């Protein structure tokens, strides 16, 4: 019986390989894994073809566009450390820190302000609170104000002072790029030799850059961490967090967005022997501290306050952890083992002392409650079930209800009880944000959908196609502009209510 099953499995595998070869040879199609691990035929360019297409577009863009008043100087370093002194500032030169890391200059509600400065927004919770947006989308959809080719990778955008920043794979280089939000024009790039190739997940960098106080902190898939000048992309300092920590890379690459905590940039290299979480000086790149020995995961750290205690909350491969903001003490933990350590979504703060967490691969979801006990915080499980399984699309919270993708189907769950309110609509393994009581869903197939955030029923208001190819990247919004991208394209929409 076992021998027969093995023969059948081998035959199926051989058949899949033959099918893949035929599709590629005669139709130019390749089998690409979707978020559920199912192979799907798609048109996929080679890395060289994609890089050449992006460069042709950018060259034509430069030739046709008049100069912008903001700097548009390209800066490219080889990774050897050359030219790292350019633009270095001392800590005394930095502006006084704002209470909210997302605070910047410019009029409130304008893209000139520094608002969407972190992965999934200023609070990393996927909610847009800057002001009203247009939510009267026609059923036929919206027209992008610009759309253009992009390099590979799963990073999102951050947006500050009329610029959108992201990181892409272009040929054999990882490239941080700055774009003018209104026109899509590329303002500068900073590139270094690095290639992350992964047949199931896809190629390119995963971690979204972080903007703070005129600097961009970008992490590549192979551990390269750079502080860049927002105006021209010049390197202020650089390091490799994997080399620094003696850590090996994760199977799907470094994915955690750098986190600003006071004067520090906190990252998750996952090294052994107190090297798992590390902090670097924002101004100089000097290593400040490191702690813990967990293997890391694919979620980004968050700076939150629970029970009046500021803390860094993050997923490792096997647990959710609360760490003191200075890295000196583990405050609490909640075991959360997942197949292959794939914790890839963001926890959500639910009130003063509760957190929602979820993972896919059968793990499900839970709400935990923290209480003070002496000098440590204790954890109580409020509820846990499998009604919400976020594989790598994080949920959002609206008026006591959690909205998210239960694997590939949208669902609503009561945050207090875990009760399923509804489940409906198929969006693949896409991403979603909360805006003015609506859910903006970017589907795995590249559609944009607008869904009413209500516990009553699944109510999709509009849906239309935007991007071609597998789409796992989180959308970004600032100043009324919605930006989306995937492994091959990027686009922008004007959702301002007044213009």
Each PLM stretch: what is its role?
Residues 4-7, 11, 20-149, 175-177, ...:
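Aromatic (tryptophan-biased) beta-strands that constitute blades/sheets of beta-rich domains
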Residues 121-124, 169-171, 221, 270-272, ...:
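Short loop/turn segments immediately following the C-termini of beta-strands
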Residues 145-158, 189-210, 238-260, 270-275, ...:
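Extracytoplasmic beta-rich repeat domains
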Residues 180-183, 229-232, 281-284, 324-328, ...:
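Short loop/turn segments that connect beta-strands within beta-propeller blades
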Residues 363-365, 470-499:
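Blade-level signature of beta-propeller repeat domains, shared across WD40, Kelch, NHL, RCC1
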Residues 363-365, 387-453:
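Loop/turn-rich, solvent-exposed surfaces of beta-rich toroidal or solenoidal domains
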């Amino acid at each position: 019986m076992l021998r027969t099953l093995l023969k059948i499995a081998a035959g199926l595998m051989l058949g899949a390989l033959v099918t893949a070869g035929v599709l590629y040879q005669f139709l130019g199609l390749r089998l690409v894994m979707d978020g559920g691990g199912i192979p799907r035929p798609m048109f996929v360019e080679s890395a060289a073809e994609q890089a050449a297409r992006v460069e042709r577009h950018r060259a034509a863009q430069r030739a046709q566009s008049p100069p912008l008043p903001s700097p548009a100087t390209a800066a490219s370093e080889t990774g050897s450390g050359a030219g790292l002194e350019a633009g270095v500032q001392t800590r005394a030169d930095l502006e006084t820190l704002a209470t909210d890391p997302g605070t910047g200059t410019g009029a409130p509600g304008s893209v000139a302000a520094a608002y969407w400065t972190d992965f999934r927004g200023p609070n990393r919770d996927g909610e847009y609170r800057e002001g009203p947006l247009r939510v009267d989308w026609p059923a036929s959809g919206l027209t992008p104000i610009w759309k253009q080719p992009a390099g590979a990778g799963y990073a999102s955008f951050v947006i500050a002072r009329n610029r959108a920043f992201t990181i892409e794979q272009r040929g054999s280089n990882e490239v941080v790029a700055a774009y003018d939000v209104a026109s899509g024009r590329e303002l500068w790039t900073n590139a270094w030799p690095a290639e992350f190739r992964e047949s199931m997940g896809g190629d390119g960098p995963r971690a979204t850059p972080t903007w703070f106080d005129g600097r961009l902190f970008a992490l590549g898939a192979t551990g390269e961490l750079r502080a860049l000048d927002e105006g021209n992309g010049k390197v202020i300092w650089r390091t490799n967090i994997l080399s620094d920590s003696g850590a090996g890379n994760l199977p799907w690459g470094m994915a955690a967005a750098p986190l600003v905590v006071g004067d520090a940039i906190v990252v998750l290299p996952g090294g052994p022997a107190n090297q798992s979480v590390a902090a670097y000086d924002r101004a100089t790149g000097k290593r400040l501290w490191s702690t813990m020995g967990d293997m890391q995961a694919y979620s980004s750290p968050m700076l939150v306050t629970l029970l009046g205690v500021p803390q860094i909350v993050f997923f490792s491969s096997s647990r959710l952890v609360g760490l003191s903001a200075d890295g000196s003490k583990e405050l609490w933990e909640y075991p959360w083992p997942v197949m292959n350590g794939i914790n890839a979504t963001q926890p959500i703060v639910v009130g003063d002392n509760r957190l929602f967490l979820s993972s896919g691969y059968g793990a499900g979801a839970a709400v935990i409650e923290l209480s003070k006990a002496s000098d440590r915080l204790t954890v109580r499980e409020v509820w846990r079930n499998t009604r919400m399984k976020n594989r790598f699309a994080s949920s959002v919270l609206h008026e006591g209800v959690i909205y998210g993708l239960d694997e590939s189907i949208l669902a609503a769950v009561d945050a207090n009880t875990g009760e399923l309110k509804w489940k409906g609509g198929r969006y693949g393994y896409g991403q979603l944000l909360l805006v003015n009581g609506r859910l903006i869903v970017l589907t795995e197939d590249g559609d944009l959908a607008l869904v009413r955030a209500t516990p009553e029923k699944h109510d999709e208001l509009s849906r239309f196609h935007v991007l071609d190819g597998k789409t796992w990247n989180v959308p970004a919004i600032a100043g009324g502009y919605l930006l989306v991208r995937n492994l091959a394209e990027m686009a922008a929409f004007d959702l301002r209510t007044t213009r």
